[in-house]
A protein has these predicted regions:
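N-terminal targeting/tethering segments
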Residues: 1-94
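A C-terminal, polar beta->alpha supersecondary segment
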Residues: 95-155
Length: 155
């Protein structure tokens, strides 16, 4: 997969907006994009998938949260302002990204379930065991290193 500079710039803008305006290096944006792609490959390897119904339900829930909760509306409005996009552009980006976001969350959940089964822990999405959370984060953090030999950075 080839990552174009326009995608890197877009990711930098997103990461900067999410971090309160902090500057993001190209390399950090590229690494984040690569981790996201690798997570999708891992999810597919485990047989995970996302339905259009799941995407539609999550999109509707996000729009409802915007309408129902002032703090959500304020956060999204501030994000749009800092990213220099309209609310419609924000929702278009969310809708385009949701299948991958949901699939990455399913991967996290599956890794957590596997860890809990191996360690005789109860898997929960709310207040999950700390050991499980550390395992999942360490697993995901190691993905880039696992695939580093297959990655070529170009200018």
């Amino acid at each position: 997969t080839e990552l174009r500079q326009s995608l890197v710039d877009y990711e930098k803008k997103n990461l900067s907006a999410l971090s309160g305006g902090k500057e993001v290096r190209d390399r950090d944006a590229v690494d984040q994009l690569l981790v996201n792609l690798i997570m999708l490959d891992e999810a597919e390897r485990l047989g995970l998938s996302v339905t259009q119904e799941e995407v539609d339900a999550e999109f509707a829930a996000q729009k409802k949260n915007y309408e129902d909760f002032l703090e959500v509306r304020t956060y999204i409005d501030e994000y749009c302002k800092s990213a220099g996009i309209t609310l419609e552009e924000y929702y278009a980006a969310i809708q385009e990204q949701l299948p991958r976001v949901i699939l990455r969350q399913k991967l996290r959940n599956e890794l957590g379930r596997e860890y809990c089964a191996e360690h005789r822990l109860e898997f929960t999405k709310v207040n999950p065991p700390e050991d499980m959370q550390r395992y999942v984060e360490n697993y995901l953090d190691g993905l880039l290193d696992t695939y580093r030999a297959d990655i070529t950075y170009c200018k």
